[in-house]
Structure formats: structure tokens, C-alpha cells
Amino acid sequence: YLQIAGEYQERYPHDIVLVYVNGKLQELGKKLKKDCALHFVTTGETIGNLTYRRGVSFLLVKAVYDTIGHDKIEQMRIHFSVDKGYYCTIKGEQKLDQELLARIEERMHEMADMDLSIRKRSVHTDEAVEMFRKYGMKDKERLFRYRRVSTVNIYSINEFEDYYYGYMVPSTGYLKYFKLYLYDEGFVVQMPEAAEPEKIPPFQPQNKLFHVLKESTR
């Protein structure tokens, strides 16, 4: 559906990221096999905005591992929503400071400019466990060790793979709007909302609410 979306894009004010095919939501990477009714979804809609955020999260995780290196990271986590973004932490040898955060953000923009394909494949749960063990993603390794389903969907950018539940954008070129801010013991990746999908809102965290969320997720 990617080519068809490209042909219709100029009719839409925001980026098309998903498509309803005969009423069923699909990713743009799927192939059209027969005549059907299509309805495109943009980043200006809630489900489209969530898909965009999922893509930025994946881009961020890859940028962190690219910048710091797998062997120096004990754990990289996206915790919960803060303001208009997600609070994240990196556990490992490297000290998180403004210089490192700027390098991570620069790597994200670099990959967005490269418009790398985001591919999906279905793997056996055992393979997913081994993959996350190799990457040092201990929380995801534990998650899949006790999952009862036999297969899971894994997304990849080049050779880097990760698991996300939900729909994904077809390539990194869609992921143009984000900003990283140092915050508390980690940082926040700030992203647009559906109402203004090309505008990154200013970072205005509610500190009391943040500390309540932080305590509740320990």
C-alpha cells in the first residue's frame, strides 16, 4: 500500500502512516492483493500519532545502542508518559549528560534522513528470547520467556531488531519531529500530538505527577 499512499499523499495535510483495507487497519508495508476499499490514516489522527510515537521510540532505542555500544549498556528503558513524551533511562558504563544526549539525537536525525526501511518478521518466542539475551535487553528476555504464544512480531532497522506491540511506520523517513531533554535520572523524548503533528510542543513537565509515576513503577 506504500506506493498507493504516495500517490494520494498530496491530498492529505499530514503524513499517511496506516491504511484501513475493507475496514481492517493495516501497515503500509503490506501488499495489495485484490481490489478493495482503502481509507488512509495520517499522523493527525490518534492511531496515526501513536504509530508515529512507536516509530520514534524504536529509532531512539537504536540510536542509543549505536551511540553508546551494546557492550556498555546494561539496560535501556522507556518507562512512561511525561508531558508530551516518554521518560527513558540508560543503565550502564556511560554517564548520561547533555553531550551524549545531543549525540543520540543527532544519530536519530541522521537515520531519519537516510529513510531506512523498517521491516517486520514473525519469529518463534524462543528465538526472540535468545535475541534479547544477546542484546542485553533483560526485561524483554524475561517477558518472552514466560509468554504462552508461540510467535511474536519483531521489527528491524538494518540489523537492529526489537519488539513492539502495535502498528509501525514503514521507514525512518517518517520520523522527523522529536526532541530529547535531560530530566531527573534520565531523559524525555518529546514528540508532537495528533492536533499538531509537525510541531514539537515545549517541554513542561509536572514534577509532582512525575515523581508519583516514578514511585509507582519502581
Predicted features along the sequence, with ranges:
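Catalytic tyrosine of NAD(P)H-dependent dehydrogenase/reductases that use a Tyr as the general acid/base
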Residues: R54
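Short acidic beta-strand-loop surface patches of small beta-rich interaction domains
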Residues: I16-K30
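Short amphipathic, charge-patterned alpha-helical segments
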Residues: Y1-R11
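Short, glycine/acidic-enriched capping/hinge loops at junctions between secondary-structure elements
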Residues: G6-E7, G29-K31
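A short, compositionally biased
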Residues: R11-V17, D83
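Auxiliary tRNA-acceptor-end handling modules of aminoacyl-tRNA synthetases
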Residues: K30-T51, A63, T67, K72-V82, ...
